[in-house]
């Protein structure tokens, strides 16, 4: 059984990680250890590079906190131009996989508040009345009428980031 350290305590992210690992490595193939670590970037990262830096830093911090594991995984959500997206970074003892998620265009009314310095989650909670929406369906769930959720989009990115770990051609 793989010991997977998730650099998050967010249920939407943990669910995506657990589901992806189960699909790639088999049901009950891993034990998740969720830890809260700093990203080293603002609460609402802006741009692809700042967001990826946040995910990479979370992995570094998770490895320092829990050095005995098979995998360390971080998901960092950010804003790029007029959209929200995330970076997934996965590391093992000797390898790294990274993938960027699908992007969701955001309405101007939401973007204006984010550009004024607010994080997307609290802005969406205020607009929808859903407390802690970032730990649930997220903006993705709201704007796709529930067809996708934060977790489902993260799940795809985790699957992509896992590709180097189960395909020999990457080694």
From Swiss-Prot:
Record-level GO BP terms: nucleotide metabolic process; thiamine metabolic process
Record-listed Mg(2+) binding positions: 38, 68
This protein's record includes keyword Translocase: no
Disulfide bonds: none
Gene3D superfamilies cross-referenced by the UniProt entry: 3.90.950.10
Sites where the protein binds substrate: 8-13
Annotated transmembrane regions: none
Reactions it catalyzes: XTP + H2O = XDP + phosphate + H(+); ITP + H2O = IDP + phosphate + H(+)
Cofactors that this protein relies on: Mg(2+); Mn(2+)
The protein's enzyme class: hydrolase
GO MF annotation terms: ITPase activity; metal ion binding; nucleotide binding; ribonucleoside triphosphate phosphatase activity
Known EC number: 3.6.1.73
Domain of life of the source: Bacteria
Keywords: Hydrolase, Magnesium, Manganese, Metal-binding, Nucleotide metabolism, Nucleotide-binding
Cofactor binding, per record: Binds 1 divalent metal cation per subunit; can use either Mg(2+) or Mn(2+).
Function recorded in the entry: Phosphatase that hydrolyzes non-canonical purine nucleotides such as XTP and ITP to their respective diphosphate derivatives. Probably excludes non-canonical purines from DNA/RNA precursor pool, thus preventing their incorporation into DNA/RNA and avoiding chromosomal lesions.
Membership in a protein family: Belongs to the YjjX NTPase family.
Subunit (UniProt): Homodimer.
NCBIfam families assigned: inosine/xanthosine triphosphatase (TIGR00258), PRK05074.1 (NF003459)
Name recorded for this polypeptide: Inosine/xanthosine triphosphatase
Source species taxonomy: Bacteria, Pseudomonadati, Pseudomonadota, Gammaproteobacteria, Enterobacterales
């Amino acid at each position: 059984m793989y010991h997977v350290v998730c650099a998050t305590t967010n249920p939407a992210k943990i669910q995506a990680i657990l589901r992806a690992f189960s699909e790639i490595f088999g049901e009950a193939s891993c034990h998740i250890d969720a830890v809260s670590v700093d990203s080293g970037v603002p609460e609402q990262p802006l741009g692809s590079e700042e967001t990826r830096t946040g995910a990479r830093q979370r992995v570094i911090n998770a490895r320092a906190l829990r050095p005995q594991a098979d995998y360390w995984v971080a998901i960092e959500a950010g804003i790029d131009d007029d959209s929200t997206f995330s970076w997934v970074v996965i590391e093992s003892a000797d390898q790294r996989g990274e993938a960027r998620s699908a992007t969701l265009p955001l309405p101007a009314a939401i973007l204006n508040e984010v550009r004024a310095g607010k994080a997307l989650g609290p802005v969406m909670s205020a607009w929808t009345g859903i407390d802690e929406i970032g730990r649930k369906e997220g903006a993705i769930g709201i704007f796709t009428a529930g067809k996708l959720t934060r977790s489902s989009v993260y799940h795809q990115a985790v699957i992509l980031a896992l590709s180097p770990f189960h395909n020999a051609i990457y080694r």
